[in-house]
Amino acid sequence: MSVTESKAKTERKSSRKPAKTQETVLSALLAQTEEVSVPLASLIKSPLNVRTVPYSAESVSELADSIKGVGLLQNLVVHALPGDRYGVAAGGRRLAALNMLAERDIIPADWPVRVKVIPQELATAASMTENGHRRDMHPAEQIAGFRAMAQEGKTPAQIGDLLGYSPRHVQRMLKLADLAPVILDALAEDRITTEHCQALALENDTARQVQVFEAACQSGWGGKPEVQTIRRLVTESEVAVAGNSKFRFVGADTFSPDELRTDLFSDDEGGYVDCVALDAALLEKLQAVAEHLREAEGWEWCAGRMEPVGFCREDAGTYRSLPEPEAVLTEAEEERLNELMARYDALENQCEESDLLEAEMKLMRCMAKVRAWTPEMRAGSGVVVSWRYGNVCVQRGVQLRSEDDVADNDYRTEQVQEKASVEEISLPLLTKMSSERTLAVQAALMQQSDKSLALLAWTLCLNVFGSGAYSNPARIRLECEHYSLTSDAPSGKEGAAFMAMMAEKARLAALLPDGWARDMTTFLSLSQEVLLSLLSFCTACSIHGVQTREYGHTSRSPLDTLESAIGFHMRDWWQPTKANFFGHLKKPQIIAALNEAGLSGAARDAEKMKKGDAAEHAEHHMKDNRWVPGWMCAPRPQTDATERTDNLADAA
């Protein structure tokens, strides 16, 4: 939305021959009539004033500021009314501005106003002349005027005070004054608007401004550039800083003024930064945090990286994770925590005090968790600091693998993830979790454009090479079932996977050309990067892995092979809780899940609990591991299963 005052559209001229004569008489009369002064209180809007649309409060306020600064530069045209009153036929906005100043006690009610008094029969002609010939200053004229005053040494604040504009508006117009002359000429000729100029002003180099302008004209329909195209050409390798969690974490001070592209015309005063530079700064800060934790907590090594260590993907061959020790609070901490919880529970509503109490309790638990790592554990392990879902992710107790322990880890992983029979899972839960799994795979695939493209090509080849080509061109059908998936998945529209999909959808929607749905040739202007992102996202949206059960047999998940290909792990997108998973299981299934995760002690404790308590118990103990139900994972290759059998035999 433009924030700059712009030229109003001129109405089509109408034939007003009788008015012409009146205007000639009026002009002659006004030239001969001397100005007189009348008290402001005696002036009212004339009933013969042809203007019916009220003046905007902003325009009246600006004029009032101008009158306050330089006085009333133009007289009012009035005619006599009964009772020593005068009707204002020409100058209604000036009258409104004067009344505003009087209401603010800036001028008295009897302040003398310069007027010219005309006969009542010419009042309508005067009003028509005033309103019919009114022409707001063109933006190009305003830019030139502001530039001339700035060259005289006046500051934006001084210019604004003098003319009744805000300093912010003056700054913005002076920013446009630095545009290349050819662009300002196009604005003066009404070939472009101030919105085009605002987008071009993102680029400081005038030569680059002209290049972008010409490129946008060539790609625009009929040679008319699109604002969106200009903005994309200027910032194609950059990301917006407004609302960007990475930029907020790194901080604006990390970048020099030359590295930040400030958008003076955005409502949130945002801007743009190079995406590569932002990621480099983020990685540098993550490494700094990791170094601080290593030194403060006594770990052997540390690492800062863009993504968390994944123990079931390619990282599995490099890293392994120590089981997190149970946090133990001291007696003083237990006492303090109970006190805080009592105060927290006594509060009826969320407030500043509750936030402070919650933060202190969270800090105490966090400190206890860190303290639980023994010096021996820290001596042979490291801490990894990464970026996940817009926040810093800290992984403690990470160990580097040696070649000798790879086989042991494979055995342990297979033992922990021994599959439960999918037939024992209720159909409603099967539908819920396979929907959740589908959304997660969609989000993971969306992030790997090369795999998405391969999947798309493979799917098309099944149709073309398997059953013959279609007679009509590009007869491709895609069904996006987010409505049913979010309805069935426990996380709904609040899940991490769906929110990531919607964020990418919003980003891509902003890149689509104007009128794209009506004309496929608009896509010819898109870069290969954008096209690849669109293909990747749309392919991901087509993924469908909801399982069914017929005649007592559960269908195999179609996601198994794809998950293996993209290195997918469900816990990257989903956290099992009582509400979304454990509460839907039978108590023996909860106990079995704890045993599968290697939490035999917790499983024994769950045996003594009621089902609801056991579900909460499982949620608590599963929150920091990577366990996923066996029937929600892709099956291991047969060779792995054979090796596991051999290992079991050797162990026996």
Swiss-Prot record:
One Pfam family of this chain: ParBc
InterPro entries the record matches: Chromosome_partition/occlusion (IPR050336), ParB/RepB/Spo0J (IPR004437), ParB/Sulfiredoxin_dom (IPR003115), ParB/Sulfiredoxin_sf (IPR036086)
GO biological process: chromosome segregation
Listed Basic and acidic residues bias regions: 1-13, 641-652
Disulfide bond positions: none
Molecular function per GO: DNA binding
Region of interest called Disordered, as start-end residue ranges on this chain: 1-21, 628-652
Family statement: Belongs to the ParB family.
Name recorded for this polypeptide: Uncharacterized protein YubM
UniProt keyword list: Plasmid
A GO CC annotation given for this chain: chromosome
